[in-house]
Amino acid sequence: MKPADWLILQRKVRFGDCDSAGVIHFHNLLKWSHEAWEESIEIYGIPYKDIFPDFSIRKSQIVFPIVNCEANFLAPIKIGDFLKVKIAPHKINTHLFQVNSFFIKNGNKVAEGKIIHCSLDIDSRNKIELPDQLERWIEASNVSTNLKEC
């Protein structure tokens, strides 16, 4: 499997994604950014429940709250647009990682998102090291190559 398989995803803009002006509602860009990295880890081979557990089934000891996020709109994104979503994850330190998302329409970057997550122990709420499987996904993603494409 090549990094492009889990780092370059597709999205079609639907009616419900947009506001009355026919462009995407601002909050959807961050939602799509998060959904892109969720989909990416699944394609890479990390079981969804290992990162986003169902606490009614089993209690995970790690949670990944968002500690910072931002979105930049560079051009209108409208109903019916097909977008390529390129993600670029990287490790900030032992307990923080960032996922950048680039939204491409017809070869042009139209938006970008950034989400930073912190790895915490669920009981103590102390910072803990990122799990090995998440570190492997970040390393395998070869962020420098992915960023050059955007």
UniProtKB/Swiss-Prot annotation:
The active site is at D19. Pfam families: 4HBT_2 (PF13279). Keywords: Hydrolase. It comes from Prochlorococcus marinus (strain MIT 9215). This is 1,4-dihydroxy-2-naphthoyl-CoA hydrolase. It comes from the Bacteria. Belongs to the 4-hydroxybenzoyl-CoA thioesterase family. DHNA-CoA hydrolase subfamily. Disulfide bonds: none annotated. HAMAP family: DHNA_CoA_hydrolase (MF_02101). One of its GO terms (molecular function) is 1,4-dihydroxy-2-naphthoyl-CoA thioesterase activity. Catalyzes the hydrolysis of 1,4-dihydroxy-2-naphthoyl-CoA (DHNA-CoA) to 1,4-dihydroxy-2-naphthoate (DHNA), a reaction involved in phylloquinone (vitamin K1) biosynthesis. It catalyses: 1,4-dihydroxy-2-naphthoyl-CoA + H2O = 1,4-dihydroxy-2-naphthoate + CoA + H(+).
